[in-house]
Amino acid sequence: MVSLTTYCLKNIVNQHAHVENTVLLYHLGLRWNCKTLYQCIQCNGVNYINSHSDQCKNKDLFLMKVIVKKNLAVARTLLSWGASPEYARLFCRNAEEEQALNLQHVADIPSSKILERLTMSYKENDEQLLITFYLLNLSTKFSTNLHEQVRFNIVSYIICDLAIHQTFKTFYAKNYSLSTLYCIFLAIYYKLYMALRKMVKIYPGLKPFAYLIGFMFDDETVTQTYSSTDDEILECKNKIIVIKGCYGNIHCRSDIDHMYAFSQNNFW
């Protein structure tokens, strides 16, 4: 059942979403980055244009981001729209924030659910992938153990071919976050070029990695944009060529049995 608060917010945003009322909308948690927020009727996500599009944002991911950015007004709105309080509590920095959002009695969320939400569920448009990238790399809430689980989650989901394993291993040795490598991989796999450009701008040292992943998937847009002549990259590229010759095209599977089998082994 939709709450009275949700109905009120919807009525306010529909009647007052113009320039002279932005102060009111900010106080009510209906503005973010100088844009008015709307709840999408079709996908139940959040957008800026009051109609469904491929840029609708997942409410749980968006909730995590606004809490990291300390915007509790928007967080309250997203919670009233049905975003998960468990994920909100995960990103609260102290008891005061939990109390302000009425989360003090919310149970802790299992690490496995956090990983599923952050690294596997939302990877099919630029906006959601960039939010995931932001959360994985800038949040201070993740423990060492959680990052270790992220590592195994990535292994179980992506490293379904020795060529991918070799590429990840090469860059993991250079102290790049596996969660960062994972997001860049997804950007190329799903051809999210805008997200890829933003990620590589933050970590320019990963241009060769983007090139190798693009090479594995025969993506000329990526290989031409991030071409590299580095000797180490050439060596890794040659290994990919050999493996492709032996095993054919690379396939990434995500079924449960396959993921579980990989998660039982340490490939690093």
Curated annotation (Swiss-Prot):
Induction: Expressed in the early phase of the viral replicative cycle.
Keywords for this protein: Early protein, Host membrane, Membrane, Transmembrane, Transmembrane helix
Transmembrane segments: 176-193
Top-level lineage group: Viruses
Main location: host cell
Localization in the cell: Host membrane
Cytoplasmic domain ranges by topology: 1-175
Disulfide bonds: none
Membrane topology (UniProt): Single-pass membrane protein
GO cellular component terms, semicolon-separated: host cell membrane; membrane
Parts of the chain on the Extracellular side: 194-268
Function text: Plays a role in virus cell tropism, and may be required for efficient virus replication in macrophages.
Family: Belongs to the asfivirus MGF 300 family.
Name of this chain's protein: Protein MGF 300-1L
